[in-house]
Amino acid sequence: MNLKSPTVTVEKTQQEVFDFLMKVENFEQLMPESKQKFEKLNDVRFLFQLKGMPEIVLEHKESTEHSSVILGAASEKLPFTLTADIIDTGDNKCTTQLVFEGKFNAMMGMMIKKPIQNFINTLSENIGNL
């Protein structure tokens, strides 16, 4: 399953957005209002839970300086990655798009597609409001 958020313009430099996303505790500011739990587990890992959903642990998997931050599920039960692509547009601005990639069976994919799309759209909108 491959889902993409709309591309948003951020009134911050590419470096500022990259630095923000490299700190896992900052993801709490990006979470939807339906967030029930958020906990920083260490410098590269955090746990969150949205209303009606199970707890999910995300961790930094890799990054490309200034342009990409990749988070992934810490559990192999639901293998997925969430990539933030950050593109410099000049004038101290950048654009950001989130890309979700997961390996799920067809039934699971049908059940989670809409909630995940809504989730990454909200994260993206909130990045745009930084």
Question: Predicted segment positions?
Answer:
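Hydrophobic ligand-binding cavity/cleft-lining segments
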Residues: 1-39, 45
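Amphipathic alpha-helical hairpins
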Residues: 2, 8, 30, 69, ...
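Intrinsic-disorder/low-complexity, polar/charged segments enriched in Ser/Thr/Lys/Arg/Asp/Glu/Gln
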Residues: 2-7, 45, 55, 68, ...
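Generic structural detector for well-ordered beta-strands
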Residues: 7-11, 47-49, 59, 85
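Structured loop/turn residues at secondary-structure junctions
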Residues: 9, 13, 61-63, 74, ...
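A short, structured loop/turn motif at beta-sheet edges
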Residues: 14, 61-66, 86-95
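Glycine-rich portal/gate segments that line the openings of hydrophobic small-molecule binding cavities
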Residues: 29, 38-77
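Beta-strand/loop substructures that line and gate deep hydrophobic ligand-binding cavities in soluble
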Residues: 74-125
